[in-house]
Amino acid sequence: MSQLLTARQAEELHKSIIAYLASVNLTESSAALRAELGDSVSIDDATLKKYEGLLEKKWTSVVRLQKKNQDPTSWLPRSPARHILEGHREPVTCVAFHPVFSSLASGSDDTTIKIWDWELGELERTVKGHTKAVLDVDYGGPRGGTLLASCSSDLTIKLWDPSDNYKNIRTLPGHDHSVSSVRFIPSGAAGSPMSGNLLVSASRDKTLRIWDVTTGYCVKTLSGHVDWVRAVAPSLDGRFLFAAGDDRIPRLWDLSSAETKSTFLGHEHVIECVAIAPAASYPHLAVLSGLKKPPPVSSSAEFFATGSRDKTIRLWDSRGNLIKTLVGHDNWVRALAFHPGGKHLLSVADDKTIRCWDLTQECKCVRVISDAHGHFVTCLRWAPPLIKDGGANGESETNGAPAATATTNGVRPDPNAANKISIRCVIATGSVDRKVRIFAT
């Protein structure tokens, strides 16, 4: 079996080929393939009907993408959404893209996680295990072994194995209150920058915890926030964490020393979301900061964004200096995502909109999707770019910036890194309207 496909994906491919051959009257070829696959594929007339158009649909989506001439570094989402994914019974709280495949995970107040095929707009499975609201999800983990992590109001973090039907392989207890945010920490290692065994969680118990996903042990607790920590983001090289919450004071943590490197003062209300700028944004943010030249791309955690219930987005440098305040949303700002191309910042809010801010034009709001959802928009994620020369499992992906530009442990940045990534022009949003929307080329 191909290492690029899970058992489920391989089975669906086989069914699609059999159904396609039958639909174009190549009955002998269809029968021969069924005979060769034997009991590994169970297919009846109803299954044939279901899968007969799937192969063509996949193929035309590939052709459509190949025909796109637009520069992906300038692509911005526009209405209408390509897909509206419905199935959750309560508000959607979080979404996350698989780093390689066309899978999207969404979490909800209904205690479930749903796995969707975002290309087809179809539900793949529902994952159950949490007993209260799922507050965040994230894909990552050791090289060659992508996992899905989830956290919940039930005080736990759970790890799920996508290659084994999303089996719950580990539960991480330890927090004393709701776990609000969870992110895999990149290793920064050459050739596999986004892989790593560490996971960070943020909680209403006012702490950040670092976990080893291979053992399930909490290896470090970061204390310093004086109220609920709602959001956390790791730097691309895994050296720093940027976190914020109800105390209104974001903190930049040095993971090696477990100490606060910088604090950021300015917000007037609870901070709902944080983001670390990719290296591709450095030239534009350096201009806004008044710097004569941008920081080297080998440096991580140079610029940051925060979104707050005070309805503003603020941009900062690593010393805690406020660069710019972005005003435009009419309600709580709930999620942020830097464009992998570096020129834009995207935001969603309880005003039901998606806003696109141009970092090259003094952070002017250049697009508003006013009908993004029918209720508060709670979450936003950008599909991580793919590294073109990744390994067989494709596990050398990045999360928002050219991975090879990150420097860790003396590894020199690759000057050709920008040519090695493929930006996926896809975002997902979730809402209190219980829907997930996919905006894509």
From Swiss-Prot:
Domain notes: Dimerization mediated by the LisH domain may be required to activate dynein.
Subunit structure: Self-associates. Interacts with nudE and dynein.
Positions with biased composition (Low complexity): 398-410
PROSITE patterns: LISH, WD_REPEATS_1, WD_REPEATS_2, WD_REPEATS_REGION
Gene Ontology MF: a single term: dynein complex binding
Stated name of the protein: Nuclear distribution protein nudF
Keyword Nucleus (UniProt): no
InterPro entries: Dynein_regulator_LIS1, G-protein_beta_WD-40_rep, LIS1_N, LisH, PAC1-like_LisH-like_dom, WD40/YVTN_repeat-like_dom_sf, WD40_repeat_CS, WD40_repeat_dom_sf
Keyword presence, Protein transport: no
Keywords: Cell cycle, Cell division, Coiled coil, Cytoplasm, Cytoskeleton, Microtubule, Mitosis, Repeat, Transport, WD repeat
UniProt-annotated location(s): Cytoplasm, Cytoskeleton; Cytoplasm, Cytoskeleton, Spindle pole
Domain LisH positions: 9-41
Superkingdom field: Eukaryota
Naturally occurring in which organism (per UniProt): Neosartorya fischeri (strain ATCC 1020 / DSM 3700 / CBS 544.65 / FGSC A1164 / JCM 1740 / NRRL 181 / WB 181) (Aspergillus fischerianus)
The protein's role, per its UniProt record: Positively regulates the activity of the minus-end directed microtubule motor protein dynein. May enhance dynein-mediated microtubule sliding by targeting dynein to the microtubule plus end. Required for nuclear migration during vegetative growth as well as development. Required for retrograde early endosome (EE) transport from the hyphal tip. Required for localization of dynein to the mitotic spindle poles. Recruits additional proteins to the dynein complex at SPBs.
Pfam family, one: WD40
